[in-house]
Every structure is written in structure tokens, then in C-alpha cells.
Curated annotation (Swiss-Prot), chain B:
This is AP-2 complex subunit sigma. The keyword Ion transport does not apply. Keywords: Cell membrane, Coated pit, Endocytosis, Membrane, Protein transport, Transport. It comes from Saccharomyces cerevisiae (strain ATCC 204508 / S288c) (Baker's yeast). Belongs to the adaptor complexes small subunit family. Adaptor protein complex 2 (AP-2) is a heterotetramer composed of two large adaptins (alpha-type subunit APL3 and beta-type subunit APL1), a medium chain (mu-type subunit APM4) and a small adaptin (sigma-type subunit APS2). Interacts with APL1. GO terms for cellular component: AP-2 adaptor complex; cellular bud neck; clathrin-coated vesicle; intracellular membrane-bounded organelle; nucleus; prospore membrane. InterPro entries: AP_complex_ssu (IPR016635), AP_mu_sigma_su (IPR022775), Clathrin_sm-chain_CS (IPR000804), Longin-like_dom_sf (IPR011012). It is found in: Cell membrane; Membrane, Coated pit. Present with 1390 molecules/cell in log phase SD medium. GO terms for biological process: endocytosis; intracellular protein transport; vesicle-mediated transport. It is a peripheral membrane protein.
Amino acid sequence: MDRKKTLINSSVSNNNSTIKGLQLFIADLRSAQQAQEQEKRIQSEIVKIKQHFDAAKKKQGNHDRLGGYQRKKYVAKLAYIYITSNTTKLNEILFGLEQTVELLKSSIFSEKFIGYMTLELLYERSEVVAKVNDEVNYQLMKDLSSSDDNFVMLALNFVGVVGELTNRLAYNDDITTGVFKILRSPTSSIYLKKKSALSFLALLKSNHSILTEDLQRKQLWIQRILSLLDDTENYRLTLATIPLIDFIAKYIDPSYCTRLLPQLTEILYNCVVVGTSRSSDNQFPLEYTFANMPNPWLITKVVSLLSILIASPTERDSGSLLQTNNIDNELLNKLRKCVSVAIELGTRQAQDPMERIVQNTVLFSLINFASKLDPSDEAISNSVTALCSLLTSKEINIRYLTLDSLVKLCSSSGKPAIDAVRYKNLDMIFHLLNTERDSSIVRKVVDLLYTFTDVENVKIIVDGLLQYILSPKNLAEPQIKSDIAVKIAILTEKYATDINWFVIISLQLLSLTSNTTINDDEIWQRLCQIVVNNPSLHRITCERLVDYLCKKQASEAIIKAAAFLLGEYSSLITDRISSANLFTLFAEKYFSAPNVAKAMILTTMIKLYKTSPEIGSNVIKFFQLELNSLDIELQTRSFEYLNIIQLAKVNGNTDILQILFEPMPPFNSKSNPLLKRLGSLPASAGSTTLINTPSEASSSTPDLLSKRANSSRSIMVPMPPPSRRNTIDDANSKISSSEDFSGKDSYYSRQILAPNWREGFTRMISHKQGVLFTSSLMKVFYRITTPDAQQPYVFHISLAFINLTEWEITGLSTQIIPSKTQGNPEYLILNINTPSTATIGPHKRAEQSYEVSIRKPFDVEDSPILAIHFKCGGSTNTINLKTAIGMTTTLISSDVNPSMHLNLAQFISRWKTLSDALGKEGEYQKSGIKLNKDFRKVETISLEDGLLLLTQTVKRLGFDIVDQTSVRSTLFVSGIIHTKSEGNFGCLMKIQYQVNGSVNVTCKTTTAGPLAKYIVECIKNVLTK
Amino acid sequence: MAVQFILCFNKQGVVRLVRWFDVHSSDPQRSQDAIAQIYRLISSRDHKHQSNFVEFSDSTKLIYRRYAGLYFVMGVDLLDDEPIYLCHIHLFVEVLDAFFGNVCELDIVFNFYKVYMIMDEMFIGGEIQEISKDMLLERLSILDRLD
């Protein structure tokens, strides 16, 4: 863009949209060379506009003297003044607010537009909002419900732009419902729906309670929003809807959104794989591509949402998310295919700059997502290789993004990624470190190196980093050098195995600090802690410190560390240097040191005196000198130390010194304070390498050092770094903490079930197959099988959805919601296959299956909920059903296993054994269970018929009945309940038929606890349905 | 995944467009300072040897690109992937270019309100809402002709 154009033709657009007065004003301002001149012009214009506005106000009541065009012109000028003054002149233009609001009321589009546009700019100021909010909201409501789409559009834009600047709109129920109404209305144009989706998002961001306050509204509105994705033909609405869903999944409730997985996968697959295939039958809408590449916007948005919905390997227990082992294999493979195609596309040569940007967008978005797909080691290593080939790219952005992506990959995928990088590309990375001139890239290189350092390569990497800091040609910002120093300190502490090397490097690092502006107390302090805690380091560190002190220029950090450590351990190196010489050394350094270091040296001196009283006269002289110090701290210290020495002399022994300056006890700070300063490294980066070597993770490094050095003393010190939690984690923990007291997921208990759900539920307890649900639109069949006879606690549940209408059912998706996903749940839902098709033709069917594995006893009322969502004939439907899996479902009938059959004597003896062992524990009684309506006129049924029906029911459940004739009115029943984690339980029951048509049940189980109750509840359900 | 703000200023640091999408600060002085800092940071960068991405604060990084004498800058969350925002910026500039016909800084100066109209058609709630250039231009020409 250059300034080749003259003023005259600068406005190419149609004439009636230009505002001549405004153009002249702007031209005037531009021709004014001096800032002062401009300022004068602005002020005179402001005065003029003020006069016009005042005049208009006086004439109120009469017809509008100012006129819409004039008003628009003046307000636009004020807006220009605001922008061009870099938003500083707010107060000078505030007088125009009233007339700006007046513009909103205009029925002329261009006037209304200028009004809204100006307010969009000014709404970032709370004083503006406070003044005009009520009036604006009123006008906003009128425009939202206007019959002119362009007015609605302006109102939606305004909400979308200022919705987050003030929460006044988001807490106005009329506005939130107004916007939502446009979003859900079948008659709104796609254009308005798109805008309303994003405006609604802006409101939701300011006020989550729009959706969370009222449960019913939450369910209803979220389903409405999700159904906007059903239109698979039109990606344009999808594009605007996904960010809204993204936000809901992240901050409101992800559980509603997990059912979108098949749809999202389909979009991604279409964009990345189908959209780019060169085959002639590539029938995909043009919109799936952009600049000859897959549509980057759709891809990044879909990937972002998928990343939220799929739990990463490290957050396995976050309940409401999808786990990779639970995702339909076909979908998982499709997603993986997308990643590999993106890598292929991303490494292709592209000429057009836009094409290259898009290429990178797609590549990095998918590569960063790949770690969520439980990739094979080979796949990871392939991604890494592809990425590393981009490190040599000429484009700086690509190198930056590649490094960023490698850091993420190494942190999330662990060893396979790390190995692939470090074994083949270390030289390359060091080369980048030394040649890059962009500090943000250098930072990424350092992060990457840090991420894959371990015991094996710590020396090479630390050496490379140290060279970088030392090299004078790297004029990088001091901040970076300081960050690198911190990282070196952490790495040496974490991975050093060689004491000598550890000490050399650490001191080298400290000695640097005077040359660069690194000023890190934390580094020398940490070193002192480590040395104190590891006796094997005492002597060697002290020796080296003396060497450093003897040099002319010792850095402040070296002096401080020396003052502290030599004070403690000088007695260990008397063969190298006498206390007297050490004292002289410190006395020399004293005068050039800053006050904090001086104070430390004073303490060192008295410690030296403690071990070598023969240097007393020098020490006393020194302290006496410092009594005159200008610094109060130094003066006080000298005075106190002098008195202590005198006291010792009077007593004739050094007891008081020994007590006051006892040897330093080991430090027990739990974590390395340096770890807080890792900066922008991803959450797990600090601990990645620890994962590979768990033995190291459990112990702490200084400790480790001493062990490796065969020290017999084991010392406690800092714990491994607490891994930082990322934002997603936090969001999830917030959500999962909303469990109710029974430990059930609140999401489960909040489901509103279909009115006649219980009928199918009861049928499912007693029958292995049948009808689960029927309505005028859909019929659902179920079938329960036990795929493996050895595992009677694992059930395969097949569902069939039949379309009963004459129309198509579209957008079919389901969710299986367990009562608990966290905290050791009673059962798990496994191997969920998504419905075989999302579209069911009239009278056609779709099928689906999943498995339930029962881990321990639970109440049948806590069975999984099946949520079915679909569209039919323009209506959006949700059916929530409970699919019964009871403890009785795990029974194996004695027809299959005759050995379980008991005779009466066995039954009685076992009953007695249970009574003796458990007493009333593990027993449950229920009397007066009324038989259901199928046994009509129960009073008239004979005992025989009643017992026959009971027998049939109980047998169908899988119980075994003892053959006996001695107690006619009672059935003696036995069975074995199976669970995965807690094993099998025996169960004995007496079911007594009363003449009045009711039944008493007494149930005993071989375990204390509520199992007996759970069994009786199943039976009661079947008998009374 | 949302744009925190869109800025456009020239080489001298004069602001041409400013749009905040979230509450950056209740203190207006702070947002003016932020703009000044962003200008200093970006104008000091070497576009040959430095990338188009730079961290700005502990909650924001900047994605920017220079077109002739104008810088277009977007502020986004630190965790966001950068390249898509370059797409945003590039598409925005392409639409401006097509709308004004070989756009230059003067077009943006004199028709700032139209540029805001274009921005509103492309970005609301910090998200991009339309990416089809044809669709955008068709809609914009209708709006531009409305009385």
C-alpha cells in the first residue's frame, strides 16, 4: 500500500455513501504540518460541532432542525478525532454522546450505522456505558426485533463487539433472549444466524449464568446451539458456531458436546483429506478449501474443539471428556489420517505466500493436536522428522512455529518424540541457537533443549547453553541470558551425576553474573542449599570458591556463595588455605562489595574466628572499624559480633560462639524455587524427562548426587517439581467438582428423562431384548448379550433406532452417560460405537452398540442414561432414557450351569451359615410388594397361579429355585452375582407369596453392604412395573 | 481462540484502527500506554530476521504484519496457535484491497467508518465470522450503497 493516490480519487466507492464535510475535515488535518496546527483545527471543529448540537437541543419539540445527515457528519468527525488522537480525546468529545444515541433511532441505515459504529468505539470506556446504556439497550431491543435485516445486523454487530467490554448487555435478559431468538429461529437467514451465534458468544463470555443458572434452559439452549452444526451442507454457519460450542465445552459443560465427535471428525476429514484429494470425484464444496489448500479456519476451529473434547493421556481421569480408548476406532483412524495428510501437505513446496501461510496453519494445528490421538511411537517419530526438516526453512515464521511445535510435542508425547529430536537433530538445534537473531526464537530453542535434557546429554547441552551466554557475539537481551542461566542451574541440579562437573558448572554460572546483568540471588542460594545438604560437595566447592576469590574480579554471586559456604566449611580446607589468609581474602573483597554481601562477610568473619580463635585480633579490629559504618545494618552487626567475641573472651571459652553459629542443618525447602521461572514452557515440560526415569522422579537431585557419589548419608531435599496445570485442566476440575454428595456426576443427575422412560427400563431388567422406547417419531430396540462367558460382568448392548415417520431423521447422535466417571466408578462404559448413520430414511433404521463392564455392586437406578439427539421435520429432539443394567443382569441361569443348583437342605444350611457369619449385615427385607397390573385382580389369583408367575419372573432374571414342597407359599431362590473388581457374591432369597396379592422378599448376600438391597430393588421393579 | 484486539497504525505510530474485544483495563490510560508500547515493540523489530509473532505480556502475544507503511496487529492468548491469525490479517487486507481497489493508507484514513463496517462484517466477538471474499464483497457493496 503506498500513497500513490491523490485525495480526489481516494474514495472509490459510491458517492451517496461519502460524507463530504468529513472528508474535508480529514484533509484539513492532514495538510496541517505541525501538531499544534492540527490541535487548533480539532479544537475549532469541536467548538463548531458543539454549537450545532446545542442549537438543535434548544429547538427540541419542533421538527429536527439538525437533520440526520448533519448529525451523522458531526458524529463521524468526533469518532475520527477519537481515533486519530490515539483515543486520548474522549473527554473533549463526550458532549456528542446524546446526538450519537439520537443517530441510533434514525430509520436511515447509514445514520444508524455511524451511531452504532461510534458507540462500538466509545463503549470501551465505562463512563460512556454508564451514561447511555439504558437508552442504547432500549434501541438495541427495537433493532433486534426489527423486520429490516440490516437493522438486526447492526444490532447484532454491536452486541458482538461490545458484549465483552461491559457486562450490562449480558445481564440484560431481554437482550440475551433477543439474540438467542434469532439464533434459533428457523426463519432467520444464515447471515443473521452467524452473527447471532458470535454475539451470543460475546454475551456468554461476560456472563456464564445465561446458560448455567437455569438447568432446563441450559439443556434446551445448548441442544439448540449444537443443532446448528447439523447443517452439513453449509460450512459458513459451522464456522461461526464452533467458537460458541468451543466456549461451552471449555467453560460451561463439555459433556453436552462430546456427542459431536463424529460430526467434527467428518468436517475435518472432508477438509483435510477429501478436499485435497486430486481425484476427479472430488465433489466437495469449494468452501472446504482456501487458496488451493484445505480451509484453515474450519480446520483450526474444529481441531480446537476436538482438543477440548478429547482428554490428553495425562488427564485420564477427567470424567466428562472423551478418552481415546473409548473413541470409535474408525473415527480415530480418520483423525489420524488427517494428521498424516496435513504433514504431507505441510512439507510440500508452495509458491504463493498466502498458500504457505495456510499450509503452516493446517500443519501446525494438526501436529499439535496429534498427541491427543494416542499415536504410535512410529507416528510420533514421523511427525518429529517432518518437523525437523522445517528447521532449515528460510522463513523465519516457520522456524519459530516448528520449534514451538517441537517443544509441545516433546512435552506431550515424551520419549519417542524426544529421542527422535535429540539423536538426529542436536547439531541443527545448536546451530540455530547460535545463529538466530530473534530472541523469541532463541527462547524456543532453549525451551526445546531444556525439554529433552536428561542424565545422558546434560553435559553437552549445558555446555552449549553456557557457551551461548559467554559468547560476546550473542548480544541478546539480558533477560534471555538470565533465563538461560536459570535453566542451566535447574538442569545441572536435576541431572548431574559427576560432582566435580556439577561444582565447576555451577560456579562458572555464578562467576558470570558480574559481566552480564544477570542478578539472580536464587541461583547462588539454591547452590548453597544443595552444597549444605550434600557433605560430599563441601570440600570441593570450598576449594573452587577460594580459587575464584583469588581472582581480581569476583562476581557478587560468587562472593555471597563464598561468604556463606566458606564460613561454614573453612575448617575442611585448612590444608589449602589458612583461616588467616581466608580472612585477608574476604577483607579485600569487603570494600568493593555491595552492602548485602558486606553483611554476609561480617558473619563469615566471626565464623572464621569460631574455628580459628588465633585470628582474633584482626577480626576485632575489623569489627571496630565497621562500628563507624554508615549502614545501620553493618554497624549493628559489627557491634553485636564484637560483643559476642568479648563475652567469649570473658568466659574463657567459645561456647557461646559454638551455640550461636552451630553448623547449618540441612535445608528442607520442598521445591526448587527456580522452577517457577521457566517462563512460557508448556505445562509438563519441566518434568517430561522425569517421566522416563521414574526412579529419579521420586527422589530429589541433591540427594541423588550424594547417592551416586556413594555417600552413605542420605539427605532429604527438594521434591520433584510440581507440574503446572494448564488451563484446560483447571476448567475440568472446576466442572468435575460439581458432583453431588453421592459422588454421582452432576451431569448425570441433571438429565431430564423422557416421561415414559420407566417402561423400557423395567423391561430391560427382566428381558435381554425388547423395546426400550416408542414415540410417534422413533422406536428404540435393545439387546443385551454377554460376549464372553468367562466374564459375566461385561455386557454388549446393541441398540436399533427405527424411524417411524415419513420424513428423514437427520443429525442423529447419542451419548451414553454413566452415573459416575470419577472416583472409582461402579461400572464403565467401553467400546462405544457411534450410530451407524446420522441420517435415517423413513422407516429405516440405525444401529449402535457399546459395552458395560460392572466393577462392583450398584443400584439399578444408577444405570447409564442414553441421550438421543436428532432432527425430524424441522424439530430438534432429545430423548433421554435410562438403560437398565442391574445386579441381576450378571446372573447366569442354572440351565447354563447346573452345578449351581441347590436342594432344600443345602439352602437352609447356607442360609444359617450366612446368618451366623453376618447376622443382619448383608440382609435386606421388603414386604408388601404389590404385583403389577399384568397380574390383574390379584386377589382372585389362586396361590398356584401366583406362585407360577413368581417362579417364571424370578427364573427369567436368572435365579435358581430350590425344588421343595414343604413350604408351599415360599420360593427359595439362589444365584451368583458377578462383578469385575470385587469378585462374585452368593445370594439367597426367600420370596413369600401372600394371599392378598402382595409379596415379601428376604434377601441375604455373602457380603455386608447394600448388595442385597440392590437385588431386591431389581426384583421389585420387575414385579411392580 | 479469540482475538483480544485489532490494531492498525502507520510507521509513525498514528493509530488508524483500534478495536478492543475484551475488557483490557478499566483505566483508559493503560490502554493508550498499551498501544504506545505495542507500536514501540513492533516498529523496533527487524522483519527480515524476526518472526511475525512476539510475546507482549503474560496474557497476550501479538501477531502482526506490515503492508507497505501500515502495521496490522492482533493480540491473542499466549496458548493460541499463531498462524491462523496471519490468515485473519491477510484476508482482512485482501478484502480491503478488493473493496477500495488497490487500497492505500489514505483510503483507510478517509473512509475509516467503512473500514469499521468491513471489520464488523468479518470479526465479531473476537472471532472471524465470514471468510468468503466474494460473499463479503457482495454484502459490503450492498451496505455501502444503502442510504
